[in-house]
């Protein structure tokens, strides 16, 4: 039988409202024979980010982004792609927005257009604006 002697255990919980301190000063005898620990490291599984925008909208936005940034045809541009990762600066982003407005026959408010950072965000905003237009 394996045992561990614990002379003092102290825990402290802090919250915005108050501080609570719990302290056990009496010796405690803890048996470790029936304890088991799962020490296997969890391996992260692949995950994908799903967007609310339709795949066709994402595809159109991707093509416009590639065209506006003069990217090669084999360059991968997907929903999660950030404009900055493609080398786009603020002027490029304005040109992308103008291309999107022309393609989808919409007008984006400047505040909303400035918040767009990914293909997914652009596609979601476009679908929202198209729905409002109807």
Swiss-Prot record:
A single GO molecular function term of this UniProt record: acyl carrier activity
Keyword Transit peptide attributed: yes
Pathway(s) this gene product operates in, as recorded in its UniProt entry: Lipid metabolism; fatty acid biosynthesis
Pfam families membership: PP-binding
Keywords assigned: Chloroplast, Fatty acid biosynthesis, Fatty acid metabolism, Lipid biosynthesis, Lipid metabolism, Phosphopantetheine, Phosphoprotein, Plastid, Transit peptide
Main location as per UniProt: plastid
Residues bearing PTM O-(pantetheine 4'-phosphoryl)serine: 90
PTM comment, free text: 4'-phosphopantetheine is transferred from CoA to a specific serine of apo-ACP by acpS. This modification is essential for activity because fatty acids are bound in thioester linkage to the sulfhydryl of the prosthetic group.
UniProt cross-references to InterPro entries, sorted A to Z: ACP, ACP-like_sf, ACP_chloroplastic, PKS_PP-bd, PP-bd_ACP, Ppantetheine_attach_site
Domain of life: Eukaryota
Chain segments annotated as coiled-coil in the UniProt record: none
GO cellular component, one term: chloroplast
Function: Carrier of the growing fatty acid chain in fatty acid biosynthesis.
Protein known as: Acyl carrier protein SF2, chloroplastic
Natural source organism: Brassica campestris
């Amino acid at each position: 039988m394996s045992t561990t002697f614990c002379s003092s255990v102290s825990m402290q919980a802090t919250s915005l409202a108050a501080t609570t301190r719990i302290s056990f000063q009496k010796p405690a005898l803890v048996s470790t024979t029936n304890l088991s620990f799962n020490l296997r490291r969890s391996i992260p599984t692949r995950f994908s980010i799903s967007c609310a925008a339709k795949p066709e909208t994402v595809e159109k936005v991707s093509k416009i982004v590639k065209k506006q940034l003069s990217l090669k045809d084999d360059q991968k541009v997907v929903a999660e792609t950030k404009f900055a990762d493609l080398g786009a600066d603020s002027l490029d982003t304005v040109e992308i927005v103008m291309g999107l407005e022309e393609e989808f026959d919409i007008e984006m408010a400047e505040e909303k257009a400035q918040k767009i950072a990914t293909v997914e965000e652009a596609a979601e905003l476009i679908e929202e604006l198209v729905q409002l237009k109807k």
